[in-house]
Amino acid sequence: MIDDNIENNEQTINDIAEDIVETANPEITELKAEIEELKDKLIRTTAEIDNTRKRLEKARDEAKDYAIATFAKELLNVSDNLSRALAHKPANSDIEVTNIIAGVQMTKDELDKIFHKHHIEEIKPEIGSMFDYNLHNAISQIEHPDHAPNSIITLMQSGYKIRDRLLRPATVQVVKKSE
């Protein structure tokens, strides 16, 4: 009889254990699914935060570059004037004039370094290259038998850009089609 009671108790314990496992299995499955869903959300949120950080860094860099655009435009004329002064230096001059020219050259070189530091590039099209309305401003057209139509024949003034943004187009003369 005791053995029967023990067997009955063991059976009851086994039945209770099975009931617990059956009851717990859906909960465990549900919890596992919830864990997977939370892991997926974490991965997506982390990626979204990373993308947002990259977008903000890019926007900050662009804002920094383009914030100086107005100031840089005003400096372009200074650079042009220094270049003109250097282009017209006398061939034979005394020491004082030579020193002044050296000072002008150093100033121009320093300005060019600052332009380079802030990604300001000179647009200086080659004679014979094709006119690009995105980078050039044609102030006149002339006929020329040795050059193709719409090619640049004269560079009047260099242009400048900051990265991809145009500060000032290069001023040019272009060849027009012969009539």
Curated annotation (Swiss-Prot):
<dbReference type="InterPro" id="IPR000740">
    <property type="entry name" value="GrpE"/>
</dbReference>
<dbReference type="GO" id="GO:0005737">
    <property type="term" value="C:cytoplasm"/>
</dbReference>
<keyword id="KW-0346">Stress response</keyword>
<dbReference type="InterPro" id="IPR009012">
    <property type="entry name" value="GrpE_head"/>
</dbReference>
<comment type="similarity">
    <text>Belongs to the GrpE family.</text>
</comment>
<dbReference type="GO" id="GO:0042803">
    <property type="term" value="F:protein homodimerization activity"/>
</dbReference>
<dbReference type="Pfam" id="PF01025">
    <property type="entry name" value="GrpE"/>
</dbReference>
<dbReference type="GO" id="GO:0051082">
    <property type="term" value="F:unfolded protein binding"/>
</dbReference>
<keyword id="KW-0963">Cytoplasm</keyword>
<dbReference type="InterPro" id="IPR013805">
    <property type="entry name" value="GrpE_coiled_coil"/>
</dbReference>
<dbReference type="GO" id="GO:0000774">
    <property type="term" value="F:adenyl-nucleotide exchange factor activity"/>
</dbReference>
<dbReference type="GO" id="GO:0030150">
    <property type="term" value="P:protein import into mitochondrial matrix"/>
</dbReference>
<comment type="subunit">
    <text>Homodimer.</text>
</comment>
<dbReference type="GO" id="GO:0051087">
    <property type="term" value="F:protein-folding chaperone binding"/>
</dbReference>
<keyword id="KW-0143">Chaperone</keyword>
<dbReference type="GO" id="GO:0006457">
    <property type="term" value="P:protein folding"/>
</dbReference>
<protein>
    <recommendedName>
        <fullName>Protein GrpE</fullName>
    </recommendedName>
</protein>
<comment type="function">
    <text>Participates actively in the response to hyperosmotic and heat shock by preventing the aggregation of stress-denatured proteins, in association with DnaK and GrpE. It is the nucleotide exchange factor for DnaK and may function as a thermosensor. Unfolded proteins bind initially to DnaJ; upon interaction with the DnaJ-bound protein, DnaK hydrolyzes its bound ATP, resulting in the formation of a stable complex. GrpE releases ADP from DnaK; ATP binding to DnaK triggers the release of the substrate protein, thus completing the reaction cycle.</text>
</comment>
